[in-house]
């Protein structure tokens, strides 16, 4: 069973528009042919990014010249996907799969695939790969790479399994995606899960197993169960997002960028990106590079990605906020970038840092120890230059420098680190070390003391009540940390605090944090209640509401440092010691009292040694 007559009429594919027409035709069907589309994309990517030299020893292969926008008068060459080439690759893949899997040995009751059948298909793909190759190399994600080079990356293996299952007529097997891993779901309602590929350094022994253990340990790799369960159209979107336009470390293929952008807009118009936050972020990045007339601007698309994560995935995804923060960072919008990074840390704080979460750790490490320090350093230089030469700087430059005079920017920075510290609590692996502390102190020092003191850090009433409870520190530790260690995958995520609020009357800016979880802020209603209660108490006059942002820390480390953070002078040694101490030691020995007592007693304990 090969290509259908309607599919054959669309060949040869001589241009980007021809490829888009093929995708549009397949997306109009109930079951778009994943094998065909992946082979076409892999073919085009190979000759536009991997091997751009026009081969002379392949008589069937030709290139279609067309005018190039840059330089003017130049030509660009598009590899012509001839029917004979694609049909031969298609026949080879389907014959290999159907010849290796005997469906009569795996009864499918009610048309539902069994775990043994899914495992068998994954074995066929797995055993067809080369025994030795660099698994993270570029351009090995498509079925073209699988057929012509017997190489696939991790997510490519999962996609190949789904494509093979479709070729076998197993319509209940679909791709499941987190932000750094892929597996399959199957069954009548997709309730069954199965590992089919490796992650990181490899986990071959997990193939065929469920992902329940990863969900239960609350690792980011499995998103606490809030992962994407794809249908066929979203699987097409996945292969489009997987297009790698890079020719080398410094050059991208303009043709592949244009192809990816047009295909993503096609999927967007058909509504197939609504449940795909990372695809929306990918499209927004492409629009920032080359805007499409009459289309939404990148900022709108970034916020659509965040809205998708909130609507369909309990706001448990990290990268929608990372995309937004990256956009603001590139455009030197310091305040908005810090806010988006703080929102990112607010999401991660409800996870446990596990061994296989190294990719998101690298992201946060780079942001905290490279991107933010350099962004604030640049802002400080602009602020200093503006003070020396007032009136000479552009408005945008002044706004970047003035971020260091904005207490809300400082509050966002604290909220970012509070989320990281909370992420570490209850995790089997420590997150913070002295490298983090060094750059935290450096970033804090970019803000003047009077700016830092405008941030009001308050304690929750629950902490005061906890200090009065008769049972000991061990019981409090167990109650605080127990749910993070013993949460079940079906439990809903814990409720979170409202987003960062400025003084009374201030509105929440666009791109603000998720309302259900944030690193501790006090809402206007709560502050109003506290103020009215204070007014009823016998006092000469009612206390005015705070002018600056009000912040409530969620992590024990940041609670212990709250007076150090807003002090006139920064005690770098104390902050470094506090930040790098193990959470288990801190939480077990701490006596809940005033913040200053907490900090000093903790520092003394470290000097003596444990």
UniProtKB/Swiss-Prot annotation:
Residues 484-500 have a biased composition (Basic and acidic residues). One of its GO terms (molecular function) is sequence-specific DNA binding. Keywords: Chromatin regulator, DNA-binding, Nucleus, Phosphoprotein, Repressor, Transcription, Transcription regulation. The modification Phosphoserine is found at residues 487, 543. It is found in: Nucleus. Widely expressed, including in the pituitary, brain, large intestine, spleen, kidney, adrenal gland, ovary, testis, thymus, lung, epididymis, bone marrow, pancreatic islets and placenta. The keyword Nucleotidyltransferase does not apply. The modification Phosphothreonine is found at residue 594. Induction: By TGFB1. One of its GO terms (biological process) is chromatin remodeling. GO terms for cellular component: chromatin; chromosome, telomeric region; cleavage furrow; cytoplasm; cytosol; histone methyltransferase complex; MLL1 complex; MLL1/2 complex. Its main location: nucleus. Residues 460-552 are annotated as: Disordered. It comes from the Eukaryota. Residues 214-390 are annotated as: Interaction with FANCD2. Component of the MLL-HCF complex, at least composed of KMT2A/MLL1, MEN1, ASH2L, RBBP5, DPY30, WDR5, HCFC1 and HCFC2. Component of the menin-associated histone methyltransferase complex, at least composed of KMT2B/MLL4, MEN1, ASH2L, RBBP5, DPY30 and WDR5. Interacts with POLR2B. Interacts with POLR2A phosphorylated at 'Ser-5', but not with the unphosphorylated, nor 'Ser-2' phosphorylated POLR2A forms. Interacts with FANCD2 and DBF4. Interacts with SMAD3, but not with SMAD2, nor SMAD4. Directly interacts with NFKB1, NFKB2 and RELA. Essential component of a MLL/SET1 histone methyltransferase (HMT) complex, a complex that specifically methylates 'Lys-4' of histone H3 (H3K4). Functions as a transcriptional regulator. Binds to the TERT promoter and represses telomerase expression. Represses JUND-mediated transcriptional activation on AP1 sites, as well as that mediated by NFKB subunit RELA. Positively regulates HOXC8 and HOXC6 gene expression. May be involved in normal hematopoiesis through the activation of HOXA9 expression. May be involved in DNA repair. This is Menin. It comes from Rattus norvegicus. The gene is Men1.
């Amino acid at each position: 069973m090969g290509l259908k007559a309607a599919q054959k009429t669309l060949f040869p594919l001589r241009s980007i528009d021809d490829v888009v027409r093929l995708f549009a035709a397949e997306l109009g069907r109930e079951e778009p042919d994943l094998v065909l589309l992946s082979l076409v994309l892999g073919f085009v990517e190979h000759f536009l990014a991997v091997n751009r030299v026009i081969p002379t020893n392949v008589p069937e292969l030709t290139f279609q010249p067309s005018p190039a926008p840059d330089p003017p008068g130049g030509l660009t060459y598009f590899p012509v996907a001839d029917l004979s080439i694609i049909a031969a690759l298609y026949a080879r893949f389907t014959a290999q799969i159907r010849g290796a899997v005997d469906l009569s040995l795996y009864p499918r009751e009610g048309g539902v695939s069994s775990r043994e059948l899914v495992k068998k298909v994954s074995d066929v793909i797995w055993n067809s790969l080369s025994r030795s190759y660099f698994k993270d190399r570029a351009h090995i994600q498509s079925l073209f790479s699988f057929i012509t080079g017997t190489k696939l990356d991790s997510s490519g293996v999962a996609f190949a399994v789904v494509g093979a299952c479709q070729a076998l007529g197993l319509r209940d097997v679909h791709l499941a995606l987190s932000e750094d891993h892929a597996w399959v779901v199957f069954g009548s309602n997709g309730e069954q899960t199965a590992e089919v590929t490796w992650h990181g350094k490899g986990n071959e022994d997990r193939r065929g197993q469920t992902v329940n253990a990863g969900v239960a340990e609350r690792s980011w790799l499995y998103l606490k169960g809030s992962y994407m369960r794809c249908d066929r159209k979203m699987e097409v979107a996945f292969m489009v997002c997987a297009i790698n336009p890079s020719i080398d470390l410094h050059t991208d293929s303009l043709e592949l960028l244009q192809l990816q952008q047009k295909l993503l807009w096609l999927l967007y118009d058909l509504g197939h990106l609504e449940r795909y936050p990372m695809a929306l972020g990918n499209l927004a990045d492409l629009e920032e590079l080359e805007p499409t007339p009459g289309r939404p601007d990148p900022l709108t698309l970034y916020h659509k990605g965040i809205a998708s994560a909130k609507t369909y995935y309990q706001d448990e995804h990290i990268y929608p906020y990372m995309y937004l923060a990256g956009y603001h960072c590139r455009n030197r919008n310091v305040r908005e970038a810090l806010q988006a990074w703080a929102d990112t840390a607010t999401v991660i704080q409800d996870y446990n840092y596990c061994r296989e979460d190294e990719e998101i750790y690298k992201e946060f490490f780079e942001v905290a120890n490279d991107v933010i320090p350099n962004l604030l350093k640049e802002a400080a230089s602009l602020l200093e230059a503006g003070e020396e030469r007032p009136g000479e700087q552009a408005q945008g430059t002044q706004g970047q420098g003035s971020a260091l005079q904005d207490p809300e920017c400082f509050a966002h920075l604290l909220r970012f680190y509070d989320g990281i510290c909370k992420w570490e609590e209850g995790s089997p692996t420590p997150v913070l070390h002295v490298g983090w502390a060094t750059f935290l102190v450096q970033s804090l020092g970019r803000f003047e003391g009077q700016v830092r003191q405008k941030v009001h850090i308050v304690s929750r009433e629950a902490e005061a009540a906890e200090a009065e409870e008769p049972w000991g520190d061990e019981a409090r530790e167990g109650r605080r940390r127990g749910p993070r260690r013993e949460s079940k995958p079906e439990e809903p995520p814990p409720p979170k605090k409202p987003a960062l609020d400025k003084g009374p009357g201030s509105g929440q800016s666009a791109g603000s944090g998720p309302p259900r979880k944030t690193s501790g802020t006090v809402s206007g209603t709560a502050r109003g209640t506290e103020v009215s209660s204070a007014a009823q108490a016998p006092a000469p006059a009612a206390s005015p509401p705070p002018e600056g942002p009000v912040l409530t820390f969620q992590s024990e480390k940041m609670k212990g440092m709250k007076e150090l953070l807003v002090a006139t002078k920064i005690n770098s040694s104390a902050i470094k010691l506090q930040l790098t101490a193990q959470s288990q030691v801190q939480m077990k020995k701490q006596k809940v009292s005033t913040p200053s007592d907490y900090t000093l007693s903790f520092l003394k304990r470290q000097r003596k040694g444990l």
